[in-house]
Amino acid sequence: MKFCIIGYPVRHSISPRLYNEYFKRAGMNHSYGMEEIPPESFDTEIRRILEEYDGFNATIPHKERVMRYVEPSEDAQRIKAVNCVFRGKGYNTDWVGVVKSLEGVEVKEPVVVVGAGGAARAVIYALLQMGVKDIWVVNRTIERAKALDFPVKIFSLDQLDEVVKKAKSLFNTTSVGMKGEELPVSDDSLKNLSLVYDVIYFDTPLVVKARKLGVKHIIKGNLMFYYQAMENLKIWGIYDEEVFKEVFGEVLK
């Protein structure tokens, strides 16, 4: 079978290396490529992708637009974002990755979620499924946060520090930190948290600061990615637990 990841930009993605090494190690004759699709070309290119590939993953900024071209699962419909496609059907495995990465961790409330895109939708949906009720969304544009259509309180970005000061858990679902940028949150606000969760795979300034301040639970996007990738392979019907654990540990070390 033939798979790929679509996004823009997507060159930074480790998915092709992970999946191709997994296929090789598991003795599977499959391939996983990369398709960088600018937003203005999406409507044309997505038709080609659906014809050319058995399945694919969608990342920023295409998770929401893919919905119109596939038959979405119930979870994907509620989240309004698809990140995994197999033979015309769309799924959201991000939220599963969030839930599984939080196993054994108490998510204390209130919870602050920074961002209002596809990753934020998955995080909020996962938290609601876990029974978390007091969720505060902080976003640059209030209108986009309102469009989430979840039972959450909404705040503007300039309120972030004062909101975090009153919270117990913080989830960053934006790309802030990927290039060394810092979220505008003071040490005083961060040190009162019991959980900091950043969807970015590596140590961002937020993660480094939280560690120095002694925040009890710190989770990075690599753990979410682990469970999300596992779920993708299960949907595609080609999951081998032993091989996956081995390959993932090597690729992300």
UniProtKB/Swiss-Prot annotation:
Shikimate binds at S13, I14, S15, T59, N83, D94, Y201. GO terms for biological process: amino acid biosynthetic process; aromatic amino acid family biosynthetic process; chorismate biosynthetic process; shikimate metabolic process. The keyword Amino-acid biosynthesis applies. Coiled coil: none annotated. It comes from the Bacteria. Its EC number is 1.1.1.25. The keyword DNA damage does not apply. Keywords: Amino-acid biosynthesis, Aromatic amino acid biosynthesis, NADP, Oxidoreductase. The active site is at K63 (proton acceptor). Pathway: Metabolic intermediate biosynthesis; chorismate biosynthesis; chorismate from D-erythrose 4-phosphate and phosphoenolpyruvate: step 4/7. It is an enzyme of class 1 (oxidoreductase). Pfam families: Shikimate_DH, Shikimate_dh_N. One of its GO terms (cellular component) is cytosol. CDD domains: NAD_bind_Shikimate_DH. One of its GO terms (molecular function) is shikimate 3-dehydrogenase (NADP+) activity. InterPro entries: Aminoacid_DH-like_N_sf (IPR046346), NAD(P)-bd_dom_sf (IPR036291), Shikimate_DH-bd_N (IPR013708), Shikimate_DH_fam (IPR022893), Shikm_DH/Glu-tRNA_Rdtase (IPR006151). NADP(+) binds at E74, G115, A116, G117, G118, A119, N139, R140, T141, I142, E143, R144, V199, G221. It catalyses: shikimate + NADP(+) = 3-dehydroshikimate + NADPH + H(+). Involved in the biosynthesis of the chorismate, which leads to the biosynthesis of aromatic amino acids. Catalyzes the reversible NADPH linked reduction of 3-dehydroshikimate (DHSA) to yield shikimate (SA). HAMAP family: Shikimate_DH_AroE. Belongs to the shikimate dehydrogenase family. Homodimer. This is Shikimate dehydrogenase (NADP(+)). It comes from Thermotoga maritima (strain ATCC 43589 / DSM 3109 / JCM 10099 / NBRC 100826 / MSB8). The lineage of its organism: Bacteria, Thermotogati, Thermotogota, Thermotogae, Thermotogales.
